[in-house]
C-alpha cells in the first residue's frame, strides 16, 4: 500500500501552474524530491499539507483524503521546514505540553528521551537556540508522533556535518518498520544519495521523472573526452553537454555507451549530475 498518493493534481497561481502532478510513495520508503528553485516543490508540499486547496485532482495519505477525514488526514502528516515554526518565547517544556494537547499519539517519554539525547536545554528560550538546536527540536517533535508521512522541506540546510549525519540515521530508523514514509525535498543532493529509495524530478510545475534511485543511477553514465573526436551520430547521444578545461562532459544513457570507443572516459553519475545535465538539455 502507498502512504502518499497524488493523482492528476492541478493548481494555478498568478504566475505559475502545477500541471497534472502524479506521484506515489510506498510504505517504508524515502522519496527525494528535487528540482530548481521555483520548479514547484514547495507548492506541491503546501497542497499535500492542505495549506491551500488544489483546483483539481486528489491527495490521499494512507488511503485517507482531507475530505474523508480532515483530522485524521492532518494527524497523519508531520512536517519539518527550513524555519523553526515554534512561537517566540516558548521553551522546550512549553512545546511538549502543546503537542500533548494537540496530538493524541504524542509520546511524551520518547520526546523526553530525544531531548536528552540531543542535549537540548528544557528551560532555555527557543529563540536563543542555534540553527542546529532548533532543527533537532523540530525533529524531536515529529519523531515523537505516530505520523505516517514525514515531509522535509529543506530541513537539513545549514547543518554541520555531525548533526546532519546524526539526523540521516534517525530518518532511516523512522521508516524501518515499514509503516511510515518520508518525502524529502532538499538542495543537499548528497543527503538523497545516502538515504533516498526513490527520486522525483519536478520542473516548471510538472513531474518529469520518478524512479527508484538505484535504477536511475544505472540507466545513465557520465562521458568525458575531446569533443572534436565525436562523430555526428555520437553527438546525438549526448545529454546536456558542458565544456570543461579538459574537453567536454555529458550524460548518456548507459545502453548507448557501446557506440563510443576508447577515446572517451565513462563514470557512474550521481543524482546531482543527472539533474544538472538533463536540465541543461532542456529535458526537464
Indicate residue ranges for each PLM-predicted region.
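Conserved beta-strand
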Residues: 6-9, 16-26, 33, 57
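Walker A (P-loop) phosphate-binding loop of ABC-type ATPase nucleotide-binding domains
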Residues: 35-40
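Helix-to-loop junction immediately C-terminal to a conserved catalytic motif
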Residues: 49
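Conserved ABC transporter NBD signature motif
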Residues: 57-68, 72-73
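ABC-family P-loop ATPase nucleotide-binding domains
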Residues: 75, 81-138
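Catalytic Walker B motif of ABC-type/P-loop ATPase nucleotide-binding domains
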Residues: 150-154
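C-terminal coupling/interaction segments
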Residues: 238-284
Amino acid at each position: 500500500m502507498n502512504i502518499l498518493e497524488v493523482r492528476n493534481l492541478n493548481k494555478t497561481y498568478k504566475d505559475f501552474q502545477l500541471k497534472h502532478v502524479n506521484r506515489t510513495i510506498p510504505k517504508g520508503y524515502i522519496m527525494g524530491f528535487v528540482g530548481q528553485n521555483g520548479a514547484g516543490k514547495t507548492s506541491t508540499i503546501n497542497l499535500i499539507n492542505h495549506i491551500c486547496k488544489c483546483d483539481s485532482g486528489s491527495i490521499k495519505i494512507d488511503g485517507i483524503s482531507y475530505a474523508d477525514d480532515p483530522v485524521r488526514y492532518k494527524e497523519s502528516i508531520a512536517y519539518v521546514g527550513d524555519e523553526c515554526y515554534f512561537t517566540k518565547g516558548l521553551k522546550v517544556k512549553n512545546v511538549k505540553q502543546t503537542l500533548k494537547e494537540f496530538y493524541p499519539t504524542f509520546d511524551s517519554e520518547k520526546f523526553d528521551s530525544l531531548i536528552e539525547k540531543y542535549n537540548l536545554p528544557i528551560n532555555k528560550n527557543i529563540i536563543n537556540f542555534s540553527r542546529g538546536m532548533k532543527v533537532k527540536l523540530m525533529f524531536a517533535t515529529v519523531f515523537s508522533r505516530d505520523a505516517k508521512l514525514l515531509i522535509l522541506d529543506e530541513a537539513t540546510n545549514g547543518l554541520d556535518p555531525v548533526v546532519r549525519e546524526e539526523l540521516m540515521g534517525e530518518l532511516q530508523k523512522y521508516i524501518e518498520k515499514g509503516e511510515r514514509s518520508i518525502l524529502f525535498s532538499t538542495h543537499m543532493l548528497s543527503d538523497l544519495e545516502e538515504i533516498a529509495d526513490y527520486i522525483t524530478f519536478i520542473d516548471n510545475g510538472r513531474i518529469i521523472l520518478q524512479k527508484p534511485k538505484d535504477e536511475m543511477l544505472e540507466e545513465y553514465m557520465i562521458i568525458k573526452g575531446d569533443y572534436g573526436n565525436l562523430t555526428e551520430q555520437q553527438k546525438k547521444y549526448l545529454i546536456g553537454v558542458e565544456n570543461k578545461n579538459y574537453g567536454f562532459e555529458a550524460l548518456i544513457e548507459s545502453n548507448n555507451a557501446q557506440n563510443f570507443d576508447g577515446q572517451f572516459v565513462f563514470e557512474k553519475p550521481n543524482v546531482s549530475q543527472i539533474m544538472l545535465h538533463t536540465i541543461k538539455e532542456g529535458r526537464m
